[in-house]
Amino acid sequence: LYFHPKKRQIRDYYRYLPSFYNGTEIGAWLDEAWRTNTDNIRHINWDQLYDINRNQPENSLYGSGRRAINMIEERHTDQLDWNFYTQFSHQLRNNSKINGGMNLRRNRTEYYSEVKDLLGGDYWVDVDKFAERDMGGLNPVPYQNDMDYYQQYGHARAAKEGDKYSYDYYGNNLTARAWAMYETSFKGIGINLGGEVGHSTLWRHGLWKKGLFLDNSQGDSQKLNYLTYKLKANFNYKFSAAHSIDASIIYMQDAPAFQAAFVSPRTRNSVTPGISAEKVFGVDASYNLRIGDIKARVSGYYTKFMDQTKVLSYYDDVESTFSNFAMSGIDKRHFGLEVAASIPLYQGLSLNGAISWGQFTYDSNPDYVQIQDNSGEIKNQGKVYWKNFRVESTPQTAMNIGLSYRSRKNLYASVDLNYYNNMYLSMSPLYRTDAVLSRNMTEEDIRELRHQEKFDPACVLNASIGKNWYINRIYTLGFSLEVKNLLNNQDIKTGGYEQVRLLKNKDENYQTYQPFDSKYFYMFGTTYYMNIYFRF
């Protein structure tokens, strides 16, 4: 939903929420209205959006009809992918062989936005609304999304439903890789050794010339070239039919993702400062037990991610501008243990369980550069202090216990209880920089600002049942029914993030900043899945 900046319809906009008016009568009224959904306050007022568009004045500059100031857009990521792949395998001895191959890939992804629904309007004027607001309307050039169209017709495009608007560019990726793997086994020992070497080239090709960046938006960007490689080894040993161990190690370097390689790919060709190839080092080891139908596995792992890059775009209340926040040198460290077992109880009934414990933390204080989106000017740079904070949005402790049943007549059923803990909120990097500190902040104020929220532990009960019928040993008819969250617990937080924005608080002598309220994702209530299938 795209709306006029001064007529926001997003219901969780901070000025529509009770927390913005804490301690006032309107705050108390809003709190009650949100709890009871008075006047559908939780929902978008679609009738109002249509009425606003239908009541806009006509403007002959853009033809007949009324200009929409609210509409629904559809963001496209249209891929065109060419792949060439070849491989070979050669038997060296009875128990040894070598495999190898080569892969060539050319990917061109077109990113653009399309006018999907004008909500009662007749056309959409294709200009950068935020640049128009920030720079005023005296000089129309800076807020043109397509300068070639503007120079030809003397005004911005009047986009109709189905037309492209706002941005249109290609993301290009050219990759060549060659790999080889050696496998051998003897006396219960298995060894795999493998390697890969390659090269990746990334570049942006702008299809439109933006008014804000006349010389840096259309055509090819700088081409980013990366050497890529991968080295890995795997070892396994069977003591007996019941006992075995395996271990593996890997080190690799890969090109960054296209969207992380450019500061603002929708508007210009500028490369993210500090961008580099990403590295991964990992080791893991497991012990496996199998005695009859009893199965168990114990595993440990350690993984280090290095030199990752991330770009955020947001409105910065400190600098009063829309910004791109580019971080480089992000390191993460994951390590943990996993235990799983399956024990038969009686005639098709089994007890299953698993325990997973991990510690996933940031292992560096990344460098950041904050760039004003409308000008490309660097507003701030420094360090993000989040070393030893937890990686977000995944439970780092989890347990599962359940019963499963499978009969000889192809009937199967299961029920399981899942427990999750040590799950953390996604952090705002801005809160952990020196840019938001003021002279009158105490150490306690800083700790509170930079504290990372941990979610409450949660339990979820699930169940499923299904059956297959075989017809003439050729066809299969079957069904399955799965019910998730049987206890209908809708208070479980599954993720969320700190907003990057800050509220300014001023007194006679100082200015301080208050974080916006965090946003959360919650688990659905009881959910049912029914699947009927026929295989032939």
Say what each PLM segment does.
Residues L1-F20, I26, D31, R42-Q91, D146-A158, T201-L212, K223, Y237-V283, ...:
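Surface-exposed extracellular loop regions of Gram-negative outer-membrane beta-barrel proteins
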Residues L1-K6, A68-S113, K160-G190, L224-T228, ...:
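Outer-membrane beta-barrel transmembrane strands
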Residues F3-P5, L104-E110, F186-G188, V197-W203, ...:
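Transmembrane beta-strands of outer-membrane beta-barrel pores
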Residues I69-M71, K97-S240, D367:
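Signature of Gram-negative outer-membrane beta-barrel scaffolds
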Residues Y302-K304, F325-Y431, Y533:
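Gram-negative outer-membrane beta-barrel transporters
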Residues L351, Y419-S438, K467-F536:
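C-terminal beta-signal and adjacent terminal beta-strands/loops
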Residues E392-N472, G495-G496:
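C-terminal beta-barrel architecture of Gram-negative outer-membrane proteins
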